[in-house]
């Protein structure tokens, strides 16, 4: 299941949505999708550059996607680490949207989110971070 825009027709047929788990949120203006993966002590923030005709949810198709490392605000990293600590986790894949005006929107954290394709695409040391985590060579997120 991927994110998609809810139409007026969807709302008119809202009874159908009652049969399945549904999460609704305000539509956030498209900006830059950012995946921040935290593995133990290591933080890997990556911009996901989508083509103009990409679906709302970049995960629906990876056709035409490009990736690059990016910086994230220190407060955002602290908040991610605080959330992991509160949840008792040492791994999390955080998804954000950064609007063109520079506002950051937190979408979700996935405690089992995918990461390997970014390790391969960008040559990141994510596997090494996971090995360190599994062997106990880390502090806590």
Task: Show where each model-derived region lies.
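Catalytic cores of transferase enzymes with a strong primary signal for eukaryotic protein kinases
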Residues: 22, 78, 128-129
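A conserved acidic, glycine/proline-rich C-terminal tail/linker
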Residues: 80-84
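Phosphate-binding site of ATP-dependent enzymes
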Residues: 1-72
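C-terminal active-site "lid" helix and adjoining low-complexity regulatory extension at the edge
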Residues: 71-74, 85-89, 98-141
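Hydrophobic residue at the +6 position relative to the catalytic HRD Asp in the kinase catalytic loop
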Residues: 94-96
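Protein kinase-like catalytic core scaffold
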Residues: 23, 44, 92, 105-107
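Short solvent-exposed loop/turn micro-motifs enriched in small/polar/acidic residues
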Residues: 28-31, 76, 89-91
